[in-house]
């Protein structure tokens, strides 16, 4: 709409100019516009300047002084009496040229801080620098031939040029001042390295502040020396840095030492209240102790080591607590992950090409992929404040969602894109044992070089990314046990994926058969076998018969408590030899994950629920949890992101509180049962969680309420 109006206005103005030109009349139009508006007009109306015979004149940002422009004259638009304030031809000034020695504008400490040789070389370079600035200024001010302009345009242009020239002159002066200070600092450092003896001789004199007698290039910083304060950084190099700082502080000459007898200066000029010194000079050890809060009983190096260890312990405890809350059935793996990450984050001497290494590579090997994901989520939440990035290098599983945004991209492209978007993140590369040779080779080179190359040949630095490689390298024997474990895993996943809700009901205690997983774990003492004393013993019987006992036990003793390991348990341990050697040698640490002890997990679930119930309700009333409910809760905890304690506190806790007043009137035979709610096909879990968020309370066959 605006473009059409502009085109119409331009066309009408062109017609008006053409009409006046036919009668040999003159039409003057004066208008103002911003630079952006004028450029936009040139883009949309390229022939506007020729059609209107426009002559663009820049206008200064600040209005001129009153009285400069007189009233309109008869001969010219602005009259002929106005003269340029600062004619361009009469402007011959440039950046003030400093003298070759420059004693007035130089830092007066230079002569004391540099030897005569370095001072002479500094003055030579300074003279050369000043001459270069003068030549550059004269070249910039040389005028190029311009077409003749009307007098009023020349006056406006000269006024604008004078202001631009003054601005450029001030910029040149500031730039020359900066270059001079940099040159002075350069020769101070050079003299300190080449002539250390001269610096030591003038050391006591350098602490005296010179009198600032004349303004110039010299602009000293604060005269007071800033107090040395340690910066607490979570790094194992903290102790070393503190020791270096205290050593440098103590190795400096005594600044407040008495002046020599022949010195005319006998006072120290400082800003602030003067501190009275009544104690003698302290030794290096005493100064270090004062710096570390007056520690007298513990040596300095031991305190620094203990301080760094305290930072390590704090990081380790916080991380271990988060890992144990989310994956409490993998206690050994959680402890190993916390130790490895804390050690890598604090340096641990990890270097790549002589520089500290920022990225971290961990290898999670073994089964239980859901526990690996939970630990990756804890790492991302505590160190990065976001969720981990999951990239599958193998075949996609049924329970995983496909990301349409990465369709058509290789795994390396997805990794590079994730690093490019967020260089401080946690990236989990799942199923690296199923990746092809090219992907594994590229990841191996990224570990060694610290840069990842995508499919287009572009390299990207890994930054401070925590990479987690996962693989199912483990040995499970016999094969029947492996199949049994996989079936149990699929069962839990299936139960957790279905829609289900919970119900709390009141009833009386009844004899109930113990769960099968309780019989397996809490077996009684093995009874003595009935031995047939009349049975002949054949010494020629084959000695390699493996199972010669009737009960199928590998224990040859008949009088033992049943604490022997279950068949195949010794083969469930992670075998490090099965992992490729190139991955083990390249990653920062390898963490083995064990098979899930389902019986242990079930016991922990019942124990946690019973503990919460006993805290709310009287001990005379007990709670019973059905076996099917325990399996469903285990599957939901395994797949979801909620921890067991959080779910019990948030969902079951309010239900127990609501049930507590009614239980106070019941006898000891009363029992509360946690059961599966029937007819819940239309009810689902909230927020995509695998655990129910509501509990229905039923008493005497009637629904009391539903809590959430």
From Swiss-Prot:
Induction: Targeted to degradation in stigma upon (-)-germacrene D perception by KAI2IA, probably through the formation of an E3 SCF ubiquitin ligase complex (ASK-cullin-F-box) containing MAX2A or MAX2B and KAI2IA recognizing SMAX1A. Keywords: Hydrolase, Repeat, Transcription, Transcription regulation. A motif (EAR) lies at residues 537-541. The keyword Transcription regulation applies. It holds the Pfam family AAA_2. InterPro entries: ATPase_AAA_core (IPR003959), P-loop_NTPase (IPR027417), SL_signaling_regulator (IPR051650). One of its GO terms (molecular function) is ATP hydrolysis activity. Residues 248-283 are annotated as: Disordered. It comes from the Eukaryota. Probable component of a transcriptional corepressor complex that acts downstream of MAX2 to negatively regulate karrikins/strigolactone responses. Involved in the (-)-germacrene D signaling pathway influencing plant fitness and occurring in the stigma in a KAI2IA-dependent manner. PANTHER family: CHAPERONE PROTEIN CLPD, CHLOROPLASTIC, PROTEIN SUPPRESSOR OF MAX2 1. Belongs to the ClpA/ClpB family. This is Protein SUPPRESSOR OF MAX2 1A. It comes from Petunia hybrida. The gene is SMAX1A.
């Amino acid at each position: 709409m605006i473009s059409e109006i502009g085109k119409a206005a331009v066309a009408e103005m062109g017609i008006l100019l053409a009409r006046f030109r036919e009668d040999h009349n003159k039409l003057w139009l004066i208008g103002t516009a911003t630079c952006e508006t004028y450029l936009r007009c040139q883009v949309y109306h390229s022939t506007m300047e020729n059609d209107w015979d426009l002559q663009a004149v820049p206008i200064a940002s600040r209005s001129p002084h009153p009285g400069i422009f007189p009233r309109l004259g008869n001969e010219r638009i602005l009259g002929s009496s106005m003269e340029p304030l600062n004619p361009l031809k009469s402007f011959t000034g440039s950046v003030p040229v400093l003298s070759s020695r420059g004693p007035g504008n130089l830092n007066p400490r230079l002569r004391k801080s540099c030897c005569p040789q370095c001072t002479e070389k500094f003055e030579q370079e300074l003279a050369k620098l000043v001459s270069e600035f003068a030549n550059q200024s004269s070249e910039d001010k040389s005028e190029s031939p311009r077409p003749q302009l009307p007098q009023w345009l020349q006056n406006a242009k000269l006024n604008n040029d004078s202001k631009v020239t003054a601005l450029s002159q001030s910029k040149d002066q500031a730039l020359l001042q900066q270059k001079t200070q940099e040159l002075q600092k350069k020769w101070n450092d050079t003299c300190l390295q080449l002539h250390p003896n001269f610096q030591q001789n003038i050391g006591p004199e350098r602490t005296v502040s010179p009198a600032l007698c004349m303004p110039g290039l010299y602009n000293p910083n604060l005269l007071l020396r800033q107090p040395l304060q340690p910066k607490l950084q979570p790094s194992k190099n903290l102790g070393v840095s503190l020791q270096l700082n205290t050593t440098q502080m103590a190795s400096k000459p005594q600044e407040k030492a008495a002046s020599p007898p022949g010195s005319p200066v006998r006072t120290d000029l400082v800003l602030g209240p003067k501190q009275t010194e009544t104690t003698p000079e302290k030794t290096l050890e005493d100064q270090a102790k004062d710096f570390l809060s007056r520690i007298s009983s513990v040596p300095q190096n031991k305190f620094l080591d203990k301080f760094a260890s305290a930072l390590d312990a704090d990081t380790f405890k916080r991380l271990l607590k988060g890992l144990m809350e989310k994956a409490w059935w993998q206690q050994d793996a959680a402890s190993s992950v916390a130790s490895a990450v804390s050690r890598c984050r604090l340096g641990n001497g990890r270097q790549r090409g002589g520089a500290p290494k920022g990225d971290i590579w961990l290898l999670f090997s073994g089964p239980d992929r859901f526990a690996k994901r939970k630990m990756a989520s804890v790492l991302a939440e505590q160190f990065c404040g976001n969720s981990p990035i999951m990239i599958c290098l193998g075949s996609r599983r049924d329970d995983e969602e496909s990301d349409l945004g990465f369709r058509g991209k290789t795994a390396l492209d997805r990794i590079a894109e994730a690093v490019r978007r967020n260089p401080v993140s946690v990236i989990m590369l799942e199923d690296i044992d199923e990746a092809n040779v090219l992907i594994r080779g590229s990841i191996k080179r990224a570990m060694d070089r610290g840069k990842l190359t995508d499919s287009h040949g572009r390299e990207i630095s890994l930054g401070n990314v925590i990479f987690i490689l996962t693989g199912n390298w483990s040995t499970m024997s016999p094969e029947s046990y492996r199949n049994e474990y996989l079936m149990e895993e699929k069962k839990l996943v299936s139960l957790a994926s279905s829609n289900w809700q919970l119900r709390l009901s009141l009833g009386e205690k009844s004899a109930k058969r113990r769960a099968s997983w309780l019989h397996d774990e809490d077996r009684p003492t093995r009874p003595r076998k009935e031995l047939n004393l009349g049975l002949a013993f054949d010494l020629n019987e084959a000695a390699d018969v493996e199972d010669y006992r009737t009960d199928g036990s590998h224990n040859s003793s008949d009088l033992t408590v049943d604490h022997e390991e279950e068949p195949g348990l010794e083969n469930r341990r992670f075998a490090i030899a099965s992992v490729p050697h190139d991955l083990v040698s390249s990653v920062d640490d390898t963490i083995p994950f064990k098979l899930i002890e389902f019986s242990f997990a079930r016991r922990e679930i019942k124990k946690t629920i019973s503990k919460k119930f006993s805290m709310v309700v009287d001990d005379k009333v007990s709670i019973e949890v059905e076996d099917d409910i325990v399996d469903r809760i285990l599957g939901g905890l395994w797949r979801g992101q909620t921890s067991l304690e959080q779910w019990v506190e948030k969902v079951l806790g309010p239900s127990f509180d609501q049930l507590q007043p009614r239980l106070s009137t019941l006898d000891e035979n009363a029992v509360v049962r946690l059961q599966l709610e029937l007819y819940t096909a239309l009810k689902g879990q909230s927020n995509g969680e695998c655990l129910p968020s509501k509990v229905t309370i039923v008493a005497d066959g009637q629904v009391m309420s539903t809590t959430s």
